[in-house]
């Protein structure tokens, strides 16, 4: 799910002390071989999509500093690495992996902390406290307002069902409605691009829930 013109074959220049491309290649390989095949939504394809969107958003938001762009890109590629270890609390696990791994690639303690702050900001409810964190948060959930929302959300439904985290379609639509109601985009670029479509999608889901029949043949009140 890569955006044309925003792919991963155009690496960002990094300060020489950081072996960023090697760090990125390492985690992509780890995700490719280590993620569960039942991560239908949170697979490698999601990480690559988020990375591409994050870099596109950074350009649109006027981020030009080479180090900032490199740290954002690294954070995007590592933001779901915690799924290699756990499902619940994967953000914290991802940060632990970052702290263990990235010193070997020349990242300083301060750079690693900046990456972890970005990763932890993606934990729900999102609480980004910097421009880079806002960009990563918006990239992570960019699909909520995109034309490919349906197939992507279906993959999440399949993933949650496989883990028995939701019982049926009605619970799924309730979950979606609650999530879309409380979610917000952070960057001006994403608000302009995605917010209206996301709201229209929420309106359709709420209408669907309102028309959902009870077992007795009556309709739900939502």
Regions found by a protein language model. Name each.
Residues 24, 28, 51, 55, ...:
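An amphipathic alpha-helix signature
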């Amino acid at each position: 799910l890569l955006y044309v013109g925003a792919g991963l074959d155009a690496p960002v220049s990094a300060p020489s002390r950081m072996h960023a491309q090697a760090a990125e290649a390492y985690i992509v390989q780890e995700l490719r071989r280590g993620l569960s095949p039942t991560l239908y939504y949170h697979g490698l394809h999601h990480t690559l999509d988020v990375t591409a969107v994050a870099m596109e958003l950074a350009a649109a938001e006027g981020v030009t500093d080479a180090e900032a762009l490199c740290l954002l890109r690294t954070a995007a590629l590592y933001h779901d690495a915690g799924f290699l270890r756990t499902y619940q609390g994967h953000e914290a696990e991802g940060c632990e992996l970052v702290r263990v791994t990235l010193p070997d690639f020349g990242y300083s303690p301060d750079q690693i902390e900046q990456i972890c702050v970005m990763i932890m900001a993606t934990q729900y409810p999102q609480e980004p406290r910097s421009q880079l964190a806002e960009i990563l948060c918006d990239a992570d959930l960019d699909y909520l307002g995109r034309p490919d929302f349906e197939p992507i959300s279906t993959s999440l439904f399949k993933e949650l069902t496989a883990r028995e985290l939701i019982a049926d379609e009605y619970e799924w639509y309730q979950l979606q409605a609650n999530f879309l109601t409380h979610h917000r985009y952070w960057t001006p670029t994403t608000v302009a691009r995605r917010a209206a479509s996301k709201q229209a999608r929420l309106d359709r889901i709420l209408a669907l829930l309102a028309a959902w029949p009870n077992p007795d043949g009556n309709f739900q009140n939502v």
